[in-house]
Amino acid sequence: MTNFDLLKLLMDKKVADSFQFFTSCQYKLDMAELSYNALKNLIKKYQEEETEVINKVFEDAKRTGKGTYKLHKNVVDFFGIEIDTTVAIEKVFMEIMGLLHNFFDTFAQWINSSLFGEQALPIKRASLVNVINKMSAFPEYTDQFITDFTNITANQNYSYVADFNNTQKHRYQLYVQNKFDLFSVQGEVSIQEFEKDGRSGSFVALSPKRELL
């Protein structure tokens, strides 16, 4: 069999289509990782600036007997545009969640085309749920990867990504909440709590993202 014959066979069996979905999955995760690192730096910058401001309040109080906390803005330069740090955090977080949501859609397309071959679902019908349901028609696929894939919609992290994006798209905007304790000089950046279909969503903005990625 020549290389051309092999390629034709793979294309006829729809397997060759899967490579584009594989590379797209990889690219989306790389972009999400990039945004995650930006989010980490933004949160670090915000907390360092707030720590500096609050420490100065205590230093002034110790030196003069009076320390005053003044309202101020934390800003970052976004390619020549000055924006509030909280807005920047929200922007990057939304990028991450959108990329992860898109990843799962493309991941389903990859499974559909690479494992189902000629029996693959049409692209417009190859949602994650439909692909998982069709997997039962292929009992020869039985390893841990397949088990993890078929259980993915029950995973708490997947549910959060899906619920977050659906809430943003169809219901209302979810905002980042910056909190900084003046006395302990400690900050926390979290996401506004929300509820969808009886499931509640809430966690600190930074630490769970690594697990999601």
Predicted feature residues:
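Acidic, Ser/Thr/Gly/Pro-rich intrinsically disordered interaction regions
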Residues: 1-98, 108-213
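Active-site hotspot residues in diverse enzymes, especially metal/ion-binding acidic/histidine motifs
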Residues: 103
